[in-house]
Amino acid sequence: MFKILRKERLAPGINLFEIESPRIAKHAKPGQFVMIRLHEKGERIPLTIADVDISKGSITIVAQEVGKTTRELGTYEAGDYILDVLGPLGKPSHIDYFGTVVMIGGGVGVAEIYPVAKAMKEKGNYVISILGFRTKDLVFWEDKLRSVSDEVIVTTNDGSYGMKGFTTHALQKLIEEGRKIDLVHAVGPAIMMKAVAELTKPYGIKTVASLNPIMVDGTGMCGACRVTVGGEVKFACVDGPEFDAHLVDWDQLMNRLAYYRDLEKISLEKWERERRMV
C-alpha cells in the first residue's frame, strides 16, 4: 500500500499526487514511469514520474481525468492509499550536453517534461520550454518550468493566454528566426508529437518523443504497448518510452490508442452509475 501524502488540483481535471515510495524515489531517473493499480479490482495504468523528493521518500505524478481509472484516482485525497505502485519502469531519458534543447509539453505532458528539462539544464544545455494548453484555465506549472528553463513559451489553442496556436507554431517561429536547435524533446498527445516530428524532420533536427501507448504490465510480457519504430516492433515499456520521433509509425500508434475507446467509455459509464448509487 502506498500513501498519498499530498493532492493538488492543478487545473480542471488535472490532479497532482505526491506518493510515499522511498525505493522508487531513490532509483527514479528522468523519463521513467510507474504502473499504478488503485485497488484489487482496478486496472493498471502507466503514469510518468514528474518529480521526486528523496529526503521525503516521495514521488510526484500528475494525472488527467480521461477514463475510469484516472477519474477514480481523482476522487482520492491525501491520506488515502493506492494498492500498487510499480517502478521505476522504462529506460531513462538520454541526458547529455547537446547545446540548445527545446522541450515541448502538451497538456499533462507539461508535467512530464519537467524532470527532463531540469536534468538537461543541469548538464549545461540552453533549455527552451514550449508549454501547450487548450485554454488559459488549463495552464499549470509555468513557474516550475521557468525555474529550469532559459526561455518559456506558453501557447493556448484559443489565444486566451500566451501565444495563440499550437506548440508547433511556437517551434516553427523559433526555426524561422534561425535559432540553432540541437534537440527537440516532445511529450503530449500523439497527434501533437506526430506534428512536431513532421515539422523538424525536413530540418534534420534530432527529435525524441515519449510515447503513451496502452500498457498492462509495464515489463514487456503482454505486448500491449508495442509500437513500430523504424520498421521494427518495439515495446514502449521496456524499449522506451522514448524513441526517435522521425522513425515512429504515428498512424499505427494512434489507431491502437483508439482501439479500446468504446470499451473504455462503457467502463467509465458503469463506474459513474455505481458511484451515483452509493
Swiss-Prot record:
Alphabetized CDD domains for the sequence: DHOD_e_trans_like1
Gene Ontology molecular-function annotations: 2 iron, 2 sulfur cluster binding; ferredoxin-NADP+ reductase activity; flavin adenine dinucleotide binding; metal ion binding
Keywords from the named record: 2Fe-2S, Cytoplasm, FAD, Flavoprotein, Iron, Iron-sulfur, Metal-binding, NADP, Oxidoreductase
Keyword set includes S-adenosyl-L-methionine: no
GO BP: any one term: pyrimidine nucleotide biosynthetic process
Subcellular location: Cytoplasm
Function comment: A bifunctional enzyme that catalyzes the reduction of elemental sulfur or polysulfide to hydrogen sulfide with NADPH as electron donor. Also functions as a reduced ferredoxin:NADP oxidoreductase with a very high affinity for reduced ferredoxin. Exhibits a broad specificity for various physiological and non-physiological substrates with varied reduction potentials such as methyl viologen, benzyl viologen, FAD, FMN, methylene blue, 2,6-dichlorophenolindophenol (DCIP), cytochrome C and ferricyanide with highest preference for benzyl viologen.
Co-factor requirement: FAD; [2Fe-2S] cluster
EC class of the enzyme, as a word: oxidoreductase
Activity at various pH: Optimum pH is 8.0 (for polysulfide as substrate) and 10.3 (for benzyl viologen as substrate).
E.C. code: 1.8.1.19, 1.18.1.2
Span of domain FAD-binding FR-type: 1-95
Activity relative to temperature: Optimum temperature is 80 degrees Celsius. Has a half-life of 12 h at 95 degrees Celsius. Activity increases by 50% after incubation for several hours at 82 degrees Celsius.
Amino acids binding [2Fe-2S] cluster: C222, C225, C237
The protein's name in its UniProt record: Sulfide dehydrogenase subunit beta
Details of cofactor binding: Binds 1 FAD per subunit. Binds 1 [2Fe-2S] cluster.
InterPro entries in UniProt: Cyt_c3_hydrogenase_gsu, Dihydroorotate_DH_Fe-S-bd, FAD-bd_FR_type, FNR_nucleotide-bd, PyrK_electron_transfer, Riboflavin_synthase-like_b-brl
Cross-referenced Gene3D superfamilies: Nucleotide-binding domain of ferredoxin-NADP reductase (FNR) module, Translation factors
Phylogenetic lineage: Archaea, Methanobacteriati, Methanobacteriota, Thermococci, Thermococcales
Catalytic activity: n sulfur + hydrogen sulfide + NADP(+) = (n+1) sulfur + NADPH; 2 reduced [2Fe-2S]-[ferredoxin] + NADP(+) + H(+) = 2 oxidized [2Fe-2S]-[ferredoxin] + NADPH
GO cellular component: cytoplasm
